[in-house]
Structure formats: C-alpha cells, structure tokens
C-alpha cells in the first residue's frame, strides 16, 4: 500500500466561507491552480497547473487507485475538487489529517494544530499564505493601476507566484508531519468508516425551497422597514435601531435608568403596568426588530448549489471532546422550533409574499418567518422526508452508564422520566402526578432537575435552565438539588468515581476502569505526546491533551488539559471535573448510538441528508404508506446497539414534505 499526500490551491469566484466548499467547487470558473504531493514521504513535488503543467498519467491513476491511500488536511475539500474532474472518488481511499487531529483532542487548522503539537519551524505552515490566497485565489477589484482586471494570474506577479508555490509545498510538509506525530494514536477503522459515510451525506445535500427563502427575505426586509419607520414616527429618533439612542429615549420617557436593552430586559419592561402607550409600542417594536434577522435565510441563499441543494451542513467530529458533529453554513443544529399552525398555509403566504394576510392570520411576521426557517428544507418533487429522533437519549445513556435501575425501568416501560423523577424526589406515587391533581405541580420540579442536574450542576444550573422563570422560588432550589442527588445516588457516585479515577491515572499513570469506561494515561515517548484518554464502550476514545493536576478554588485537586477555549478561541489550559467528564462521555456515547444508527440506515437503503444530535432526516421516494415507512426507520433506530445491548432505546418521528419540529 502506498501513501499519497496532497494539497491543492484553487480559484473560484464563489466565496467559500459563506457558500461552502461544494458550491465553491461547482462554480464554472473553478480551477485547480497548484497540485503539491508526496508519495510515501518522499520530498514534495509541485505541479503548476495554472501555467500549463499537467498531472502525469501515473499520478492520475494513483488518485483513483485503491493501492494508494490519499491523505490531505481537510480531505473533503481535496476529495471534492478532484472528484469534479475525475468522477466521484471512493471515500474509503481517503484519510483526513484534520479529522485525525480532532479525534486526538487537537484543534482544527493546519497552522493551529502544528503549533499545538509543537512542530519545528521548518515543519510548520508558512505565515505568508493568507495574503497570497487573497491575491491569487479570489477575484480582485478592478482598478486603474491593475488595468481593470478582476483576477490576478501568475504572470501579474511572478515573485508572488513562486512564493505561493512554496507555500503550497510546505502545506504538504506540515500535513505529513502532523500525521506522523499522531500515528501513535490511530483512528479506529469503524470511526474512519463513519467519516466516509459523512462525506457521502454532506455531498448528497438537502433540497431547499428557494421560493420560500426569497419570499422570507422580501417580507423580512419590508417588515424591518415598516417597524423602523413606525419607531421613527413615535420617537422622532434618527435611528431607533441604535441602542444608545433608544436607551436615552426610553430613560427620558420612563423616568428610570436602564443598564441595557437585552432581550430579557425588554421583556421585563413590557410587563410594567405604568408604561405609556408610546413606550409600550416602542418596546414592542424593539422586541419585534430583535426577531427580524433573516441571517439563516441569507445563509441558505448564499450556499444553495445550482441544483437547488445545500451541501456541507455538518462537520464530522466538529465538537471538541465528545466528537459530535458541528453545524456549518446554516447551523441546522440551532434552528427555531415550529409551533405555528397551520404551517402549509404560512409557507404558501410567504412564498407568494402576502404580508397583510400573514400578519392577519399569524400575528408577528418576524416570529413566523423565524419558525419557517426549518421548513425551507424540503423533499424534492416525488420524494418525502422521514424524520426520526431518539427519545431522551442523554437521560437514557446516563442512566445506563451509572446503572441507575429505577430510571432504566422507567425507560423500559412508560418513559415518563419527569414524573418518575418527581415521584422519587418527593416520595409521591407517580399515579398522582397528573393533570388535575395538586401533585402535578411537582412535575415541573422534576423536569427542571432532570434538565439541569445530571452533570453535577447545582442551584446555578437550575437557574440557568429557567427554574425561576417557571415560578420556582429561589429558596426551594437547594432542596431540589439535594433531593435529586439522593434519588440518583448511582449518578452522583459516578461523578466522584470519574473524578477520582482521572486524578489517579494522571498522577500515577496506568489505567482505571469505571462503569465500563477505561481511563488511562497514554504517551508517545518518541514524539513527546501525552494524553489522558477515556475508552468508550463503542471502542472510540476521548482524548485530553497534556493532562495535569492543579488545585481549584476550594483547595481540592483540579484536573486540566490543553484545549480550545470556546469563548476566546485560543489553545489554552482548561479545567474539568468529574461531572463534566461524565457529560463528555454521555454525549459521546449518545453520538456513537447515532453514528451506528446512521450506518444501519444507509445500509438499509435509507439515505440520510442531515442529522441533529439525536435526530435523522431521510430523503427518499415513497415505497409504502407513511406509517409503514416511519415504522421501518423507527424500528432500525430502536434496535439494540451491539456494544450496549441493554441500553433501552426508543424513537419516534414523522413523514412529510418539509422539515419541521414535530
């Protein structure tokens, strides 16, 4: 078996960041400028396609041959580029070094990963690349100085072109060095297969209703203009969208100081009974304008390919620590819920730009448009969407992992975990916790406890989950925490067992088993790589780079590792603890359940077009009635997972022509 490492530099007039790689590649003016490669670690060669050089026949054959494993950093891009010219290349011949780095706990980005691994200067990515990419890879503005051209070619600056070739060559050097450094921690074959399936799903894409999208963009713009004009008329402000101007106006009109105009502040002010009609309406307009964003519709419009499908919505292994997928472009993992009825009529009114009718029937136009974003994803003519999602997957997984038997029994029977939790916490028969009984009020406490407390959260977690907004007095929160922990002793014990085991393996080395998980300290002495790992029941590992033990604010041992800070986006030392490690494992196991299920669905000829944590969406020509089709999918999702045969899974869903939250 040979190994072919590749890096391409390309040109397209389509902006890749907004439109995604598939639309970028599908542009008629797309071309590959440079092709850098190395075979079996030999010195890197470069082919200058932009200046007339050609790939030798043996290299073209190698790209399509199963005798050559192709490596690239962000391999889906190189795979997509070459597939445009050579036909769809077999995904199983490709390996992605960026994914390998993410699997091993590092960050994305060739430069960032090289620095995190401590690569020597001669092995790192050159820092001249961004300016060169801006010069050669994207259109340029026509000026008098450049003769009015809209694109820079090699002959326009030969010195820069030679630098660009060196930059491309060095990217292969860096990619190979990263792969060499990670080779002691290989990606399991079954996870590699999941990456290959993901490549196919992302390339398959999802159809979108562009009449709905364009109608929503039009109505959103008209509504925004109407609201702004009304606000200007009431307030006499030049720009009522200005927070500073509106704050000053409200302070003068209300006679009180305002710290901000955030969503919750506006909602609180709207609840005041002594507001003047003008103040009340200005606050309502402010609230409405906060919902008029059409960014997701803009994102769909920017990313839709010529065939009416959006591709590249998910990044495999995009979520740090857990290995879950991350949303890209339209962010399908963060779409507003749909509760407006009837949805088909709302969609029709938006498609035909019937603003007055939409407002008359549904009230708030911005809120309706926000909900309809989901429904922009559709089945093409002659097809249907089959949507199915796991029921309470994280609650089931943590119960199974901890061995909390009463919870497992709930999931094997009626599944009413909120009622059952309240029953356990307050010693009330579950039969009494139903609508119409005074005991039903306990369900709310059981629900917020279930949502907030599974990963060692306390009163702060309850507040963040909305306990106070539900009307639960703050003084009741400590009691809810203690009751939930007492009712879930095995889950509570799991937090502390994980914390103790992690401290032990980080300080002493070796490995410790906890409830079917194997925690270990792993080294590659040759490369100086040091990781704390957790082997999951599936056989996948979670990696924590350069682990250490410090002291937290309470004087207890504090577990830390190097990772990407989600707020600052910097590679830094991050603290963790037992409950957080449990959360990582539970979400990772839930992710593995989904990944296994996707493989089964694909094998059954049910093509997945995208998925969201615990939910899959299939686009297919109907082969039976709706109930039969849904049962087929749901039964596959309910099948026991081979490595978690006693984990009780359940699923439900719907069949329709557009995406929604049922």
Q: At which residue positions do the language-model features occur?
A:
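Helix N-cap motif at beta-to-alpha junctions
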Residues: 621-627
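Conserved catalytic core of nucleic-acid polymerases
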Residues: 256, 428-604, 648, 652-662
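Short active-site loop/helix that positions an aromatic residue
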Residues: 12, 76-87, 104, 248-253, ...
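Active-site-proximal helix-loop-helix substrate-binding element of RNase H-like nuclease domains
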Residues: 30-37, 41-58, 62-183, 195, ...
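Short amphipathic alpha-helices in soluble, non-transmembrane regions
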Residues: 629-637
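A short acidic-Thr-Gly-centered motif at the start of a beta-strand
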Residues: 1-2, 60-64, 368-384, 599-603
């Amino acid at each position: 078996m040979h190994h072919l490492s590749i890096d391409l530099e390309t040109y397209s007039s389509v902006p890749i960041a907004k439109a995604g790689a598939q639309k970028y590649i599908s542009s008629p003016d797309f071309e590959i400028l440079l092709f850098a490669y190395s075979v079996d670690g030999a010195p890197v060669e470069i082919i200058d396609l932009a200046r007339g050089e050609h790939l030798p026949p043996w290299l073209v054959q190698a790209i399509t041959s199963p005798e050559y494993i192709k490596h690239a950093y962000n391999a889906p891009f190189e795979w997509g580029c070459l597939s445009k010219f050579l036909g769809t290349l077999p995904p199983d011949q490709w390996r992605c070094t960026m994914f390998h780095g993410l699997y091993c706990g590092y960050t994305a980005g060739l430069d960032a990963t090289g620095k995190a691994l401590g690569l020597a200067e001669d092995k790192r990515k050159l820092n001249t690349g961004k300016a060169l990419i801006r010069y050669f890879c994207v259109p340029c503005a026509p000026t008098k100085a450049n003769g009015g051209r809209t694109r820079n070619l090699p002959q326009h600056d030969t010195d820069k072109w030679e630098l660009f070739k060196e930059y491309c060559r060095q990217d292969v050097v860096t990619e190979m060095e990263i792969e060499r450094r990670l080779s002691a921690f290989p990606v399991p074959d079954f996870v590699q297969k999941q990456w290959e399936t993901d490549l196919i799903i992302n390339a398959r894409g999802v159809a979108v209703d562009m009449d709905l999208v364009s109608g929503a963009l039009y109505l959103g713009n008209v509504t925004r203009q109407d609201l702004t004009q009304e606000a200007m008329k009431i307030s006499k402000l030049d720009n009522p969208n200005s927070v500073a101007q509106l704050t000053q106006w409200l302070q003068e009109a209300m006679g009180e100081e305002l710290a901000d105009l955030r969503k919750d502040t506006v909602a609180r002010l709207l609840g005041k009974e002594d507001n003047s009609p003008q103040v009340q309406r200005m606050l309502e307009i402010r609230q409405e304008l906060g919902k008029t964003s059409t960014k997701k519709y803009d994102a769909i419009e920017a990313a839709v390919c010529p065939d009416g499908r959006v591709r590249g919505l998910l990044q495999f292994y995009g979520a740090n620590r857990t290995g879950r997928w991350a949303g890209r472009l339209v962010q399908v993992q963060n779409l507003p819920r749909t509760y407006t009825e009837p949805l088909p009529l709302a969609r029709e009114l938006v498609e035909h730009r019937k603003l007055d009718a939409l407002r008359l029937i549904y009230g708030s136009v911005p809120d309706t448009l926000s909900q309809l974003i989901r429904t922009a994803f559709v089945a093409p003519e002659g097809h249907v969407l089959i949507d199915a999602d796991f029921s309470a997957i994280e609650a089931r997984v943590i119960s199974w992992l901890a061995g909390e038997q009463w919870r497992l029994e709930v999931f094997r029977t009626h599944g009413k975990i909120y009622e059952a939790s309240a029953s356990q916490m307050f010693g009330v028969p579950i039969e009494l916790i139903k609508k119409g009984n005074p005991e039903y009020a306990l369900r709310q406490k059981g629900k917020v406890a279930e949502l907030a407390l599974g990963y060692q959260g306390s009163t702060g977690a309850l507040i963040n989950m909305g306990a106070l907004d539900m009307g639960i007095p703050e003084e009741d929160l400590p009691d809810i925490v203690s009751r939930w922990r007492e009712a879930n002793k095995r889950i509570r014990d799991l937090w502390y067992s994980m914390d103790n085991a992690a401290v032990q393996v980080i300080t002493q080395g070796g490995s410790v088993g906890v409830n079917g998980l194997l925690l270990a300290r792993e080294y590659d002495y040759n490369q100086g790589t040091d990781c704390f790992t957790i082997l999951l029941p599936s056989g996948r590992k979670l990696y924590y780079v350069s682990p250490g033990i410090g002291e937290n604010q309470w004087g207890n041992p504090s577990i830390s590792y190097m990772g990407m800070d989600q707020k600052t986006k910097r590679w830094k030392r991050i603290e963790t603890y037992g409950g957080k490690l449990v959360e990582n494992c539970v979400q990772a196991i839930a992710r593995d359940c989904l990944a296994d299920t996707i493989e089964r669905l694909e094998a059954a000829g049910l093509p997945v077009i995208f998925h969201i944590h615990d939910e899959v969406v299939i686009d297919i020509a109907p082969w039976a009635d709706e109930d039969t089709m849904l049962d087929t999918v749901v039964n596959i999702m309910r099948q026991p997972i081979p490595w978690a045969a006693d984990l009780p899974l359940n699923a439900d869903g719907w069949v329709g022509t557009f995406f929604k939250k049922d």
